[in-house]
Amino acid sequence: YMENLETFIRVAREHSAYPVLITPLERRCFMDEKHLGIGAHSDYVAAMKQTAEKNNVPLVDLYSMSRMELKKAGEKNSRRWYMFFPEGEYKNHPEKSEDNTHLRYDGAVNFASLIAKGLREIGGIYAELLLDDLKL
């Protein structure tokens, strides 16, 4: 995994691009209303952080930010961000869904805003790529 990340970094730099690593989004893994279990991606997050530091590449820690958002929202309220809906709600997806991985529109917007926040915090060329205010 780390070698693969380093290949992406090297190729990006060879093409005059500015690499940035973004840790994976946390899955919904609540043990109760406010407490998350150990995330499914924690080993990948640690490896990515190590690779970013070793290669002097900025990192947006979406994993940590999304865990904080999930804890703040709680088990029940965070369902609105993921593919949780009752049977018959959607014509093209008539069956019930309790998907703790894939996002609905509101979840995608919410977590993308965390990535934008992270890029702004890095600053420089990364922040310059962002619009000041986007109305969705």
Name the predicted role of every residue range.
Residues 132-136:
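A short, charged, Gly/Pro-tolerant segment at domain boundaries
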